[in-house]
Amino acid sequence: MTEKRERPGPLRWLRHLLDQLLVRILSLSLFRSRCDPPPLQRFPATELPPAVAAKYVPIPRVKGLPVVGTLVDLIAAGGATHLHKYIDARHKQYGPIFRERLGGTQDAVFVSSANLMRGVFQHEGQYPQHPLPDAWTLYNQQHACQRGLFFMEGAEWLHNRRILNRLLLNGNLNWMDVHIESCTRRMVDQWKRRTAEAAAIPLAESGEIRSYELPLLEQQLYRWSIEVLCCIMFGTSVLTCPKIQSSLDYFTQIVHKVFEHSSRLMTFPPRLAQILRLPIWRDFEANVDEVLREGAAIIDHCIRVQEDQRRPHDEALYHRLQAADVPGDMIKRIFVDLVIAAGDTTAFSSQWALFALSKEPRLQQRLAKERATNDSRLMHGLIKESLRLYPVAPFIGRYLPQDAQLGGHFIEKDTMVLLSLYTAGRDPSHFEQPERVLPERWCIGETEQVHKSHGSLPFAIGQRSCIGRRVALKQLHSLLGRCAAQFEMSCLNEMPVDSVLRMVTVPDRTLRLALRPRTE
């Protein structure tokens, strides 16, 4: 399989730059004349009164051009898909905190030190507000669409968040683990059968055991992630229905398309695309319509299947939400948004973890031995290392509800502060030898390898931390543990695999992972 890394020539780069500048100027003009600004797009005053400024350390500011700001610099660095690398370079230039107006429209403060990142969460307020994808915000406005927890604000968010905290994060969650293990075992057993079939036919030249290359790995992990959430919501028994299996196959495809269409709108102003009715917007809009409609239909069908089975239901989130007096419409909103959020984040977190493990054969052996003794310290360390090096959300954002003092710096009310997780996780002042995968660094007594544990915050902290982190961690633990115990894994990619940003951090090329039966 041939792998190619795209290397655009100077003419193509120049044309792309001119296109983006034209889009930016036209977009700003249309925004002023025809559209109200998005409600969360804020422009805080950055010039402080002299008496106030004298008390604080000034925040370095990246200078940009009128109208387009630092857009030219971003495009020269590879565009929006390389934003995490671009900001990483800025931190090396300006330090752990700086201010930049990206693209000439959004003023933001970027922070990368562990202490500053913790400070942001201490100032997030009772109802933390985070940046939302412009395309999704516009869609919700245009369609008067009520969405799940990710899009809620204020008292409505806090009420539903407290309910889900009790059900997904706190207390005895063994009922949930049963569903995760069942779905993971089903997928890994299928890999085991295919691997055994490949190993039964040795290579003619050398007689070595033939390996099995996992086909369509990204799609398989997407399907697994969505299946896990469906089982947690309704119980494993619903998967016995062929119609639900077929619906989940189709739902997986369209959820994946939402991710792809959202990614394209990262590099083009969604409001401009909507005004001009461009295909890039029409495709996104139609796809979101379909996802919301199909997600609601799956819920209705799962409920009917459970009623028809006339037997005690599996322990499931749906019944727990009902017992908490959550309305049926709200349950649908929560479920669909959980699936959309977990589809890509869990799938790509799992890909990165498998990739990291495939490069470490000795670590695979150690994990297999650890699993045989029912120990899990090394596995926990591997998961932390994978999330540190490959955070699927390389930035976490908060709008500060009040003026705040952060590490001797003054941050104005309503400023968007972005935590640079990609930079923080690879900072040698936080982690010794940060580019290496060293699971032992997280074991008790190995603190010399971890200078600042809060340099890695893949799920954020505070009131608005990731509601699905317990599910995601258990999925990773189950998947990696089973794979390490049953397979010898290797990476077949001949070219180096790097990360690019498409809503979340993804490999810049298709991962080619091969399995052989573990013989030790």
Curated annotation (Swiss-Prot):
Q: Which Pfam families match?
A: p450
Enzyme class name? oxidoreductase
Query: What cofactor is this protein dependent on?
Result: heme
Q: Name one GO molecular function term.
A: iron ion binding
Q: What are the protein's UniProt keywords?
A: Heme, Iron, Membrane, Metal-binding, Mitochondrion, Monooxygenase, Oxidoreductase, Transit peptide
Keyword presence, Membrane: yes
Which CDD domains did the record assign?
CYP24A1-like
* GO BP annotation list: central nervous system development; dorsal closure; ecdysone biosynthetic process; head involution; midgut development; motor neuron axon guidance
State which Enzyme Commission number(s) the record gives: 1.14.15.-
Localization, per the record, is: Mitochondrion membrane
According to UniProt, the tissues expressing it are described as:
Complex coexpression pattern of dib (disembodied) and sad (shade) in the early embryo that restricts to the prothoracic gland cells of the developing ring gland during late embryogenesis. In larvae and adult, coexpression is seen in prothoracic gland and follicle cells of the ovary. In adults, coexpression is seen in the follicle cells, sad only is expressed in nurse cells.
- Give me the reactions it catalyses: 2-deoxyecdysone + 2 reduced [adrenodoxin] + O2 + 2 H(+) = ecdysone + 2 oxidized [adrenodoxin] + H2O; 2,22-dideoxyecdysone + 2 reduced [adrenodoxin] + O2 + 2 H(+) = 22-deoxyecdysone + 2 oxidized [adrenodoxin] + H2O
Pathway, according to UniProt? Steroid biosynthesis; ecdysteroid biosynthesis
| Main subcellular location | mitochondrion
Which SUPFAM superfamilies does the annotation name? Cytochrome P450
A Gene Ontology cellular component where this protein is annotated is: mitochondrion
Q: Matching InterPro entries, A to Z?
A: CYP11_CYP27_families, Cyt_P450, Cyt_P450_E_grp-I, Cyt_P450_sf
Question: What role does it play?
Answer: Required for CNS development: midline glial cells. Involved in the metabolism of insect hormones: responsible for ecdysteroid C2-hydroxylase activity. May be involved in the breakdown of synthetic insecticides.
Q: Which PANTHER family does the record match to this protein?
A: CYTOCHROME P450
Q: Any additional notes?
A: Member of the Halloween gene group.
What family does the entry list? Answer: Belongs to the cytochrome P450 family.
Q: What is this protein called?
A: Cytochrome P450 315a1, mitochondrial
Originating organism:
Drosophila melanogaster (Fruit fly)
- State which gene encodes it: sad
